[in-house]
Amino acid sequence: MGMGEPLLNYKNVIKALHYITSEEGLNMSYKRVTLSTSGITKMIKKLADDKVKVNLALSLHSVSEETREKIMPVGKSNSLIELRDSLKYYFSKTKKKVTYEYVLLRDINDSLEDAKKLYKFTKHMPSKINLIEYNEVYSLKFQKSTEEKTKIFMDYLEKSGVNVNLRRSRGKDIN
């Protein structure tokens, strides 16, 4: 996993993907390569148009415009409607399902209502949702969701037929 938004460095990301997947490079299958993005809508469409068939992971974290803009500045310039449309476009061109990354933050995006909105946002095409336990940083205002709310959130998605995983925080014992 690298740092920064890869789709804002498109030309070099495409070069890197070519190296990773070419015989002269690492010779990995595109099926084993995942590109993680915060959701630059026009570049997601460009990936599809350029026939780049990588697995796409979207850092979503909220399906409320207001909340997403607060926790992810990219939300201010890429609306959820535009984002959903670009992901549908990507799927229609590549037939690759999208993985949604969703960090559960206590009392910010972890309610049953948030789970219902997430399901509604993702149900239009095959996808997977990775719920991520927040790794608390004491100098930040965010807290991880409670076990009870996490279970309710995940149970709702599972009962709705969503392919969902919970990624637990690791390294809690490290100072």
Where are these regions (language model features)?
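Conserved AdoMet/S-adenosylmethionine-binding subsite of the radical SAM
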Residues: 2-160
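Radical SAM enzyme core and accessory elements
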Residues: 159-161, 171-175
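A structural preference for short, hydrophobic beta-strand core positions in alpha/beta folds
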Residues: 131, 166-168
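Residues at the C-termini of beta-strands that transition into short coil/loop
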Residues: 60, 168-170
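Short, hydrophobic secondary-structure boundary micro-motifs
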Residues: 29, 165-166
